[in-house]
Amino acid sequence: MSIFDVAVWDEAEHCARMLDQRRLPNEVVNLYYRSAAEMADGIRDMVVRGAPAIGCACAYGVAVEAKRLAKQGIPSHWPTAMAEGMATLRQSRPTAVNLTWALERMAPLLETTPPHEVPQRLLQEAHAIREEDIASCRAMGAHGAALLPTNSQRPTVIMTHCNAGALATAGYGTALGVIRAAHTAQQGNLRVIANETRPYLQGARLTAWELLQDHIDTTLITDNMAGWLMANGEVDAVVVGSDRVAANGDVANKIGTYTLAVLARRHDIPFFVAAPLSTVDLRCPTGREIPIEERSANEVTHCMGIRSAADGVKVRNPAFDVTPAELITAFICEKGVAKAPDQEKIAKLFQI
């Protein structure tokens, strides 16, 4: 068992297992899931987060639902039997396109697999999705590491936002995969600035913890310090992940990403986005069509369970924002790199 096993199949318990990321970094706790409804609750409640990891969790959610139904007797028509559970999973996090991608990959198997083999076949496909994601992350890490600047006078300093690492994927990470690969390529001569990422503190709780596990020099800042550090020449590049990429290269990512992209452009700092092609939604023409999840006001008014805002104040809590493609230096995926991404360049990545 790896400490970064965020969404896997537990052979001993015969069900899905997820690392409860809400408890990090203070506790390492695993939770177990035996139905699609339970898995959807786990996804919605952010036990797991990060688009690729959500996709893996969703796939295992389909597998556990089939296993649950099979215990009651093999359904005469699997698509009908699975419809409610799959709909529940689909609605759990609307912005992360990998969730829908995983469901659409699993659904045809309900029609084409002999009925008695469906539960095992779905589990095999969930395993395949997980293994493919790990390989994808390592490939984009190699592509991205070659793009990052080097600094002969001091360690290269990379800023990142939210958590796009092993905890947000099946393993290794997208943005942090690029950072891990660059750290190796530059023989450790690299530092990371992790934005704390209000209001859920994924940068402080997850990214800082994850990078420290790998002994990568990491400095934590509050989100509103980023511009000052850029203005003072303390940042060489910004690398982030994505929850959905539109066909034209616009990117939805954790709220605050757009702000960083604008600041990076102002200070001539390269701004990179790393995500697998499964995160690209070719049916979504531009970022304007990406649904933006609005989460609970409590995430803003409370911090680690303690109220920090005036009682009765109104709250906005969009979980994501959209960064226009024109602000992105390059989009990095497992197939390669699209510099100054646009619709034509994104489409070409699917042809490699």
From Swiss-Prot:
Family per similarity comment: Belongs to the eIF-2B alpha/beta/delta subunits family. MtnA subfamily.
Chain positions of site Transition state stabilizer: 162
Residue positions of the active site: 243
The enzyme's E.C. designation: 5.3.1.23
Residues binding substrate, per UniProt: 49-51, 93, 202, 253-254
GO BP term, pick one: L-methionine salvage from methylthioadenosine
HAMAP family assigned to the protein according to its UniProt record, in alphabetical order: Salvage_MtnA (MF_01678)
Gene Ontology MF annotations: S-methyl-5-thioribose-1-phosphate isomerase activity
Role this protein plays: Catalyzes the interconversion of methylthioribose-1-phosphate (MTR-1-P) into methylthioribulose-1-phosphate (MTRu-1-P).
Pathway in which the depicted protein is active: Amino-acid biosynthesis; L-methionine biosynthesis via salvage pathway; L-methionine from S-methyl-5-thio-alpha-D-ribose 1-phosphate: step 1/6
Pfam families: IF-2B
Protein's recorded name: Methylthioribose-1-phosphate isomerase
Catalytic activity from the UniProt record: 5-(methylsulfanyl)-alpha-D-ribose 1-phosphate = 5-(methylsulfanyl)-D-ribulose 1-phosphate
Species: Magnetococcus marinus (strain ATCC BAA-1437 / JCM 17883 / MC-1)
Alphabetical UniProt keywords: Amino-acid biosynthesis, Isomerase, Methionine biosynthesis
Source species, domain of life: Bacteria
